[in-house]
Amino acid sequence: MTHVTEPVVNSAPKPMTPLQEFWHYFKRNKGAVVGMVYVVLMLIIAIGANVLAPHAPAEQFRDALLRPPVWQEGGSWQFILGTDDVGRDVLSRLMYGARLSLLVGCLVVALSLVLGVIFGLLAGYFGGVVDVLIMRIVDIMLALPSLLLALVLVAVFGPSIVNASLALTFVALPHYVRLTRAAVLVEVNRDYVTASRVAGASSARQMFVNILPNCLAPLIVQASLGFSNAILDMAALGFLGMGAQPPTPEWGTMLSDVLQFAQSAWWVVTFPGVAILLTVLAFNLMGDGLRDALDPKLKQ
């Protein structure tokens, strides 16, 4: 008696969800994963600074002025990264400074992204006079150095963390306008937009419901890179005395306050500088990974 073996049919692999597909391509970029881990760590530190920081950011220890880090001769576990010229704990101020830097980055990116998307949609969808007017203003703004323009705005309205954030929002706005407009011009003549227009969809529905979701990928990447630019520019404004004012624990202001001690007490300038460097680098690496994961051309 012969046995007939039935052929085994392998089932097709289950398609990945959008989130699974995103993570599949994102994790290929090891630098992006490292950057994301660092950003998550910074978020935890910023949120839990009240609990994690060993001291208050403005607390002064007059008997421990310019105390070196714990691993250097004269250091103490009470001040792991040393103290500054008035006896404030460097580690605690770095932790609270992370909160302020990330908060400013969120504010600048959120405001510039929302306004840039609105103006970019208007320019790309309506075209004509609206497009010419918006894009000529954008061209004028881009013709000026961004940091110089921010400095002028802060000088006019007065140095403060709020005015510096609004100035950085203003100088970041043109990049989102141009990017949104370019993406809209690609989508506006596609069949689904034409069909929706024939069906009687309003201009607002066309822009914000039909077109905008298909333009989000490059905007997400730009927002990630804009986050690092906002942190770096805020540190530059703080260093020049036009951002956060002492004794606010902001990384750029920390550098400016102790610059005269750079040679005698290296730690007071090194650690804030390293914090700025690593944070900006982490957001840039993460933005590179987001581009790899969201750009269809790079997936092929």
What are these regions (language model features)?
Residues 1-37, 285-300:
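Transmembrane alpha-helical segments of polytopic membrane transport and secretion proteins
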Residues 14, 68-72, 228:
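Short linear motifs in intrinsically disordered
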Residues 22, 77-79, 153:
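Residues marking the start of alpha-helices
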Residues 25, 65, 79-80, 89, ...:
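Conserved beta-strand positions that form and line the central face of beta-propeller blades
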Residues 31-50, 117, 277:
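Short, strongly hydrophobic transmembrane alpha-helices
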Residues 37, 45-83, 240-248:
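Hydrophobic alpha-helical transmembrane segments of membrane transport/permease proteins
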Residues 83-300:
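Alpha-helical transmembrane segments of integral membrane proteins
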